[in-house]
Every structure is written in C-alpha cells, then in structure tokens.
C-alpha cells in the first residue's frame, strides 16, 4: 500500500494496506468455512504485522501468515489456489501490491488403516460406543514416526474441544478410559501380530 498521514490523506485516495489485509483475512475465513470441514480443512491467519505501526499513519505495509491444513494434499492445494485468486483480486481492486512467499509444504501423515481398525475396536470394547474418527491438523511426533513405521493415534476429548490453551481440560474418567483403551489396543495388536507371524511361518 501507501503510507500517509492519517489526518491529511483523503479516504478516497488511500491505498491502505491494513484494510486490504483485513478483507483478505475475511476472505480466507469465508473460503475456509465454505470448505465445510472437507478432509479436515482448516485455515488460520495467526500473525499480522503493520508498518509503520503508529496510530496516526495509514499503514503502508502489512505482513500476515496463512496456515492451511487438510487431510489430503488435493484438498489443501485446491483451497490454496482459491485463496491466492481471492487475495490477488482484492489486491488489484484496492490498488495494493501483494507478494506471496511459501514457507512450508508438509504432506499429511495418514494413520495406518489396519492400526486404526484395531484402535477403533479397542475404543468400542472399552466404551461400548463406536470410536469417533477425526482428522488431526496438528503436528505430532506421529508425523515423523510414520516415516519409520505404521502409526495410529488415540485422542482424549477436551472440554469444549479447547486445546493449546491454558483452559484445556480433560476429565480423569476420560484419561482412565483412554489408558484402558490403549492397553486393549496393545493386546489386540499383539494377537494380530502373532496371527500374522503364524501365517508367514506356516
């Protein structure tokens, strides 16, 4: 955009980088919501900086981050393309320049289907209810471990779904069920492994 004095630059002449960025952030939210949680799609603007960053100057430069995650590369990449088209359209309409710098491009790390089946069975055996399968967009050690061996994860529900926040809370009873389910999973895995080894050696 173009920085200028807040008291002397007419509204009709402004190339306000912050208002352009604000519209872009809202477009990112709108497009993300329209994705309807498809494949665990989420989009976040977690950092926004303005320059010169003073009360009486129209912002001339804004930097912000976009974190886009999904359970598949296809969903993520298609959504990124839609984001980029929207951001470029907003920039052109508002008369500001835009520079997009990709930082990271990490592939999803899907859980092993067979281990997931064993985990679902373990959870159902312990709770009497079907396991809820979800896409976790967070980075876990399992992402690295999946390069070495098949993996699956077990999550404990948090009050109101809050995580990475001091308000995150789990109930002791849920922790107990999770430990029991994990123990059951290990037993199912051991039995399954023994049967598999028996077939290979026969």
Stretches with model-predicted labels:
Residues 108, 118, 134-136:
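A carboxyl-terminal module marker
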